[in-house]
Amino acid sequence: MKIILRKDVATLGDAGEVVTVKNGYANNYLIPQGFAIRATEGTLKALETEKKQQAHKIEQRRKEARELSAKIEQMTLNISTKAGESGKLFGTVTSGDIADALKAQGVEIDRRKIQLEAPIKALGKYEAVAKIYMDIAAKLNIVVGAEGAEAVETAEAPEAGE
């Protein structure tokens, strides 16, 4: 009997595949358990249209992911945090902090998709990778600065002009 798998079955194949199995196996186990449906002309046509729709959705998501990747790679994330005089941070800059900085600039990415090469524990420039969709990733440029540094620089600027 020809059947269409609805779920992955280790011994038969992946979901969406058309396979031939013995009648008893299909009627007594696969179909009642929801692992498969009978392969009729109607179900085969429905499977083809579903595959086309899935391919279209995947292509649409890939296009959106490429656009988002290009947008992210043009950004520079400025993260301010508490740091000591030697430039060492009190704590670390995590992927959650980077995700929050991206969200502040209008881009929402899950923190688990941001990969750091090493923990950020000092002031400076860093790079990270954000996995956006499947094989599409974006390089993040991150500048970590001290929280009080901007206030000190702006306070010194008027004095120099006088």
Curated annotation (Swiss-Prot):
Keywords: Ribonucleoprotein, Ribosomal protein, RNA-binding, rRNA-binding. InterPro entries: Ribosomal_bL9, Ribosomal_bL9/RNase_H1_N, Ribosomal_bL9_bac/chp, Ribosomal_bL9_C, Ribosomal_bL9_C_sf, Ribosomal_bL9_N, Ribosomal_bL9_N_sf. GO terms for biological process: translation. It comes from the Bacteria. GO terms for molecular function: rRNA binding; structural constituent of ribosome. Pfam families: Ribosomal_L9_C, Ribosomal_L9_N. Belongs to the bacterial ribosomal protein bL9 family. This is Large ribosomal subunit protein bL9. It comes from Chlorobaculum parvum (strain DSM 263 / NCIMB 8327). The gene is rplI.
